[in-house]
Amino acid sequence: LSPTGYGDSPYQSCSAFAGNPYFIDLDALKADGLLTAAQLKAEKWGDDPLSVDYGTLYTSRYKVLRTAYAAWREKYAGLHGCAHYYPDDYYAFALANDSWLNDYALYMALKTANGMKSWTEWPREYRLRDAAALAKFAAEQEEEIGFWKFLQYEFATQWKKVKDYANAKGVKILGDIPI
């Protein structure tokens, strides 16, 4: 269930805690009013229904997920007089996952800003986790960092529903963690 890395291998994940955005149900985002059928249909998802084209999937899925994130931000913008107010369960999720979520989101924002290259190829101040450079980057990239947190929130919300359903039917789900 972890994000896949190079070659889409689950054993080359960048996180032992994060969920794979590939598993976010786009129809659920549509049902929540964050996507439209037209937005989903407009994307190219691959030519062969019997084979997964991960390159195409990556490009299309993240484009659609960014659209959903923009709609989510818009949906909650200005509520309670706040520029960025989100549902209570989002804050509960962020607090419960504080031990890894902020670093993961910062890492993914840095990875995106650096053309998805390995962290070993990033500018020195990021490779060595210079606190001032990271704080400056985080302040400048608040929306991008928020995107990666949103994906984890959506993944966790949907995963809990699947797991609860399976458990209610007497199905136990087992897995392993990449190390």
Q: What residues fall within each predicted segment?
A:
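Acidic/aromatic-lined carbohydrate-recognition and catalytic surfaces
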Residues: 1-179
